[in-house]
């Protein structure tokens, strides 16, 4: 009897263009997220796509997130996992706690707790100046606390700043293209960056 290959639940992504083309299509990622939920005893009926970002993120109601790392940027998995472990248990920082990790079809993933709050994207414009000042001050306090964290154990994280900056610029442009922003405006942003 011939060996049968198991069905795949993730798309074949070989290039950045492949990834960008399907990134925002939640239905593409749902089978993998359902499989991860089943593997870890989470309710797969409570999945909610949670872009934007470089990697695929779904919220599992009520209080978990699954982050799936594309093999194109698989090197992002280890540093994120190490930093989450390093910051675990800090009561002064609202940090997601690492619940589980694994791999599905050679795509690494983590499951973390949700940090309550709202995205500034949705509320910043409607906030008055005093609230914005409070948030800015609080962000400064959080950054100071984060920067005071010992870095022992994080030495293996290699940071190629030119590559990182280039990826951030490309991600920005991709987001603008997907938001259907005028191409002339995108060119202006690219010149600025």
Give a label for each model feature.
Residues 7-15, 35-36, 44, 76, ...:
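A generic structural signal for ordered alpha-helices
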Residues 2-7, 48-65, 170-173, 177-189:
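Short N-terminal secondary-structure initiator segments
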Residues 10-12, 71, 90, 128, ...:
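Short, structured coil/loop segments at alpha-helix boundaries
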Residues 2-33:
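Phosphate/pyrophosphate-binding loops and the adjoining catalytic core of nucleotide-dependent enzymes
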Residues 24-42, 116, 132, 136-137, ...:
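An alpha-helical support segment within catalytic cores of ATP-dependent transferases
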Residues 4-6, 15-18, 90, 95, ...:
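FAD-dependent flavoprotein oxygenase/oxidase catalytic domain
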Residues 45-160:
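ATP-binding pocket architecture of kinase catalytic cores
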């Amino acid at each position: 009897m011939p060996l049968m290959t198991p069905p795949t639940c993730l798309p074949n992504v070989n290039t950045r263009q492949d990834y960008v083309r399907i990134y925002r299509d939640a239905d593409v990622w749902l089978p993998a997220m359902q499989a991860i939920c089943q593997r870890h005893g989470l309710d797969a009926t409570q999945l909610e796509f949670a872009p934007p970002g470089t990697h695929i993120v779904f919220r599992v109601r009520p209080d978990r997130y699954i982050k799936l790392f594309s093999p194109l940027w698989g090197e992002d998995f280890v540093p994120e996992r190490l930093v989450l472990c390093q910051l675990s248990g800090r009561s002064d920082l609202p940090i997601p706690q690492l619940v589980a990790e694994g791999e599905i079809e050679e795509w690494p993933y983590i499951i973390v707790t949700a940090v309550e709050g709202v995205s500034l994207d949705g509320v910043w414009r409607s906030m008055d100046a005093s609230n914005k000042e409070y948030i800015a001050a609080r962000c400064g306090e959080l950054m100071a606390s984060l920067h005071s964290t010992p870095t022992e154990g994080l030495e293996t994280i290699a940071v190629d700043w030119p590559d990182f900056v280039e990826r951030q610029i490309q991600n920005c442009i991709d987001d603008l293209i997907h938001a259907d922003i005028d191409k002339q405006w995108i060119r202006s942003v690219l010149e600025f960056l």
